[in-house]
Structures are given as structure tokens and as C-alpha cells.
Amino acid sequence: MATLHVLRVFCDEAGGFGNPLGVFLDGAEVPPERRQAVAHELGFSETVFVDDRSTAAMRIFTPGLELPFAGHPSVGTAWLLAHEGESVEVLRPPAGEVAVRREGERDDGLTFVSARAEWSPPWQLIEYDEPAAVAALDGPPGGREDEIYLWAWEDEAAGRVRSRCYSLADGVGEDEATGSAAIMLAEATGRELLIRQGEGSLLRARPLGDGWAEVGGGVVLAEVRDHPA
């Protein structure tokens, strides 16, 4: 059996909502050849396997494929390592080094990661005129199966955005909170953003220049349980 931490990443101010994430802090508990199957069994939009806690070397799997980088797994893993007492300032997924910073108390504050927008999956950013139209979606428009991120300004002057995200092809369906797409949107708009995605998750994102952007938010530990390796 392997120890699985289940987090909710990008929670709102009250600790609600957030995108579920599975993290195995000791990647050696799950053989590399089993990781894709384990991610499929769990069914989270992403599952993380930390291969070395001291260097924060990590791998990220959706139910259908491995990703070189993803936002909510990076934020969640950074938070969990800090929660477990690890002083990690950089994560190391396959895409490259991801800087970590924190605001506020260790568990109750906000966790941020910085990455290049080009590391993100190829989300298509589709702007809507009205946030109500985004909120009313009951699935990807036209039954599209590609990776789409639908968004509208709630308050453009204040940088407030309403969004939804779908990725049917890799088995995710609707993604409750998508850090990599938030990074792309911040880089594309050149704006500091507060994004309300899915049912009510909150993401904070801002461009850093030269193709880099930062995304962060609140994280809650939902449960710890054993899972067959």
C-alpha cells in the first residue's frame, strides 16, 4: 500500500471548493510502470508522484497521460511539502524549475508557483462577452473534446474573471480549477487576475515578464489514506 494525500487546491476564502489532487510524497511507493494506472484509478484531474522530497523532483499524471507541468499539482505539492516541514523553494517537474513562494501562515496562507506559459498544455483561450454565459455552461460548447478554457471579465478594471475549463480527450472532463490555463491567461492579458473557476474555486495569477507568470491560491488537506501501489 502507498500513502495518498488528497488535497483541494485553489479553495475560496472559506476553504470551500478547490480542485482535488492526489499526491504520493514517497514516489518509491508506486513503481513508475504503475503510475499511469494509479492516476486512472484515482480519477483526479492530476496525481503527483514525488520522487525526491529534498529536491522536490516530481511527475504529474492525468487519468490518461503524463504532463511535463501543471498548475494545480504544483501549487498543491508545494503546499503539502511545507505542511510536512520541508523547506522547498523550487519544484522540479519534467518541464523545468518552478519557483515557490508563500503569503501568510504555512497552512492557512496562499501558495504561489512561477512557470513559463509555454509549459502549459495547449489550452485554447476563448473569451465570452458575459460571465453569466460562462457560468451557465453545462459542458464544452458543441461537444468539443479539445482542451478549451472559456472565460469572461466579471470586472475588467479590477481584473476579475469568470472561467470554466474542459479537457475531454484526456479523461478529465471539466476541470474545477486550472492553474496552467490561469498562467496562460495572465501572460496573454498582461494583467493581474482574480479568477473564479468552476463551481467557486479562486485562482490568483499575474504575469512576470519574458514569458513567465505566477499562479496561486489556498489549499486544504482533505484526507490521507492508503492506496494499492
Which residue stretches match the model-derived regions?
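Active-site proximal loop and beta-alpha junction motif in alpha/beta enzyme cores
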Residues: 1-229
